[in-house]
Amino acid sequence: MWTSSQTSKSKSNTESTSTGKTSRVVSVFHIGRDLCGHPGFVHGGLLSVLFDEVFARCVSAAFPSGLGMTANLNVDFRKPALPDRMYVLQVETTKVEGRKAWVQGRMTYLPVHLPVPSDGIEAIVPDSALLREDAEGSVMVAEAKALFIEPKFADVSIIFP
């Protein structure tokens, strides 16, 4: 999995954060055949886990402690996820209020089948093809929204002897 994140100062009047930061994360990854729930289809639970993990990385910039826990995660599956594809997961923090942060994202894949040659060297896909907002021919697999909460104990340091 390749992940890139961007943090910026809050520019919107509707966003209020204690850190003044919003963030975006783009993750690119390959899902192979061993992660299928039914033959030929990637297990939906895996997609939910990927959303949760990347969402957590995204909202961590919004909290002083860098720790956020999932309070609610809603995933809307749009099309079946197919194996042996390159997936792009784009997420952003949409709102932060105190210890709460809302995040949303979308997962797409490029329809090109990317076989791994017998020499083991993976096919190379240009970054520009993966990172465009609406890459030509990309297929929307799922959209998700989540609420993360910074735990009250996050700022407490416990030192064990």
What are these regions (language model features)?
Residues 31-45:
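Short histidine-centered catalytic/ligand-binding loop motif
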Residues 54-88, 101, 121-128:
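Hydrophobic beta-strand-centered segment that forms part of the acyl-chain substrate-binding groove
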Residues 4, 78, 92-96:
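Short beta-strand micro-motifs enriched in acidic
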Residues 51, 73, 89-91, 105, ...:
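Structural signal for hydrophobic/aromatic residues that build the beta-strand cores
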Residues 81-83, 94-161:
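HotDog/MaoC-like acyl-thioester-processing domains
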Residues 20-26, 72, 86-88, 102, ...:
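Intrinsic-disorder/low-complexity, polar/charged segments enriched in Ser/Thr/Lys/Arg/Asp/Glu/Gln
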Residues 1-33:
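Non-catalytic linker/capping segments at the edges of enzyme domains
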Residues 24, 42-65:
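Active-site helix/loop of acyl-thioester processing domains in fatty-acid/polyketide metabolism
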